[in-house]
Amino acid sequence: MSKVIETKQQVVTEIADKLRASKSTIVVDYRGLTVSEATELRKQLREAGVEFKVYKNSLTRRAAESAEMAELNEFLTGPNAIAFSNEDVVAPAKVLNDFAKDHEALEIKAGVIEGKLVTLDEVKAIATLPSREGLLSMLLSVLQAPIRNLALATKAVADQKEEQGA
């Protein structure tokens, strides 16, 4: 087998592994971004723990098929970049959506969230969600509210009995 074919097979395997392992994958069209804008986008994604790479569409199609995500192939036309996140589901959608608001050249095409294909509208909806830490803090405050109210009610009853006894 030729060296070129081996290299391409390694890339296909790499992409397929990333597709399987990532919790969130977003496909974007980066055509029209300047080098400085692309660098800024990569920096923001890196800070959010997201890997951002450009692959040949033919190799990405093969990887999507081997990862059983063939429905992603219809979005793999033109110059594409793919953002992979293995930790936070919301991070790539949030960073890319915010960047796309400021830079019209960046176009979000579709994504795969936890193995399910999502459209542009669904990616934008996911981008508006708070991060996992934000959701956990909201949950914690909801769980603490009844305990706090019970403590305040108990204190109020104790204060009232103290006033009556005095």
From Swiss-Prot:
Pfam families: Ribosomal_L10
Keyword entries, A-Z: Ribonucleoprotein, Ribosomal protein, RNA-binding, rRNA-binding
GO molecular function, one term: structural constituent of ribosome
Keyword Ribonucleoprotein: yes
GO CC term, one of those recorded: large ribosomal subunit
InterPro entries for the chain: Ribosomal_uL10 (IPR001790), Ribosomal_uL10-like_sf (IPR043141), Ribosomal_uL10_bac (IPR022973), Ribosomal_uL10_bac_type (IPR047865), Ribosomal_uL10_CS_bac (IPR002363)
Superkingdom of origin organism: Bacteria
UniProt keyword annotation of rRNA processing present: no
Gene Ontology biological process: translation
Subunit structure comment from the entry: Part of the ribosomal stalk of the 50S ribosomal subunit. The N-terminus interacts with L11 and the large rRNA to form the base of the stalk. The C-terminus forms an elongated spine to which L12 dimers bind in a sequential fashion forming a multimeric L10(L12)X complex.
Functional note: Forms part of the ribosomal stalk, playing a central role in the interaction of the ribosome with GTP-bound translation factors.
Database matches in PANTHER family: 39S RIBOSOMAL PROTEIN L10, MITOCHONDRIAL (PTHR11560)
Family: Belongs to the universal ribosomal protein uL10 family.
Name the record gives this protein: Large ribosomal subunit protein uL10
Organism whose genome encodes this protein: Bacillus anthracis
